[in-house]
């Protein structure tokens, strides 16, 4: 698929099914805990400074944000999970919204699950990966913030993450940095393959 990534815009924000775009365009969802670098990932992948607003305040994305890319596909930014300063009720509401999208959306082709390369995956990260495997949703693991770790230690951190996730070697695992753009081409290759 030929894709002009510069032709990208935020299309809409949705709280439930009735607000989703009503067409056949394939979608790639982006999931990860708060402040893992989802907005930076979107901006880097689409070569934009602030198409997706980055925030110092975790838990800012509370809706599903749909980004139209060249009228050929969409990124869907899912609310960040695991942020403690949101009420339990609010978290449950997000959980239902995310689950409804991931399990019922026919346009969904794969989920990019973002984890922080510097740390072991959280219980939420593990749960998300298990959820995606259970529902047989194709998953691409993207380990962000690779620039914060010396290159010589990347393998060690990658192994620790894979072990904690009980990683399936048939899934893609990509080391990524929005600062150096490392992993950007690999991420696009993996995404386009799923479409």
Swiss-Prot record:
Instruction: Summarize where Mg(2+) binds, as residue positions.
Output: 39, 61
Q: Which UniProt keywords apply?
A: Cell cycle, Cell division, GTP-binding, Magnesium, Metal-binding, Nucleotide-binding, Septation
> Which of this chain's residues are annotated to bind GTP?
32-39, 59-63, 77-80, 144-147, 176-178
- One MF term from GO for this chain? GTP binding
Query: Where would I find the EngB-type G domain in this sequence?
Result: 24-195
Q: Which CDD domains match?
A: YihA_EngB
Q: Which InterPro entries match?
A: G_ENGB_dom, GTP-bd, GTP-bd_ribosome_bio_YsxC, P-loop_NTPase
Q: Does the keyword Coiled coil apply?
A: no
Q: Which GO terms describe its cellular component?
A: cytosol
- Pfam families, per database record: MMR_HSR1 (PF01926)
Q: Does the keyword Magnesium apply?
A: yes
User: Biological process (GO) annotations?
Assistant: division septum assembly
Q: Which cofactor does it need?
A: Mg(2+)
- Disulfide pattern: none
What does this chain do?
Necessary for normal cell division and for the maintenance of normal septation.
Family the UniProt entry places it in? Belongs to the TRAFAC class TrmE-Era-EngA-EngB-Septin-like GTPase superfamily. EngB GTPase family.
HAMAP family, per database record: GTPase_EngB
Name this polypeptide is given: Probable GTP-binding protein EngB
């Amino acid at each position: 698929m030929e894709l002009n990534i510069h032709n990208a815009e935020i299309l809409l924000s949705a709280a439930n099914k009735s607000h989703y775009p009503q067409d056949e365009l394939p979608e790639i969802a982006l999931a990860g805990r708060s402040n893992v670098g989802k907005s930076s990932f979107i901006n880097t992948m689409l070569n934009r400074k602030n198409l997706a607003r980055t925030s110092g305040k975790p838990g800012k994305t509370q809706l599903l944000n749909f980004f139209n890319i060249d009228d050929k596909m969409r990124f869907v930014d899912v609310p960040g999970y695991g942020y403690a300063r949101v009420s339990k009720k609010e978290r449950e509401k997000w959980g239902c919204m995310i689950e409804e999208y991931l399990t019922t959306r026919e346009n969904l082709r794969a989920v990019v699950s973002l984890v922080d390369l510097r740390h072991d995956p959280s219980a939420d990260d593990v749960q998300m990966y298990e959820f995606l495997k259970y529902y047989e949703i194709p998953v691409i693991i993207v380990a962000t913030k690779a620039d914060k770790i010396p290159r010589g230690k990347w393998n060690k951190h990658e192994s620790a993450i894979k072990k904690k996730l009980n990683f399936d070697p048939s899934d893609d695992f990509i080391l990524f940095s929005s600062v150096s753009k490392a992993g950007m081409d690999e991420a696009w290759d993996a995404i386009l393959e799923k479409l």
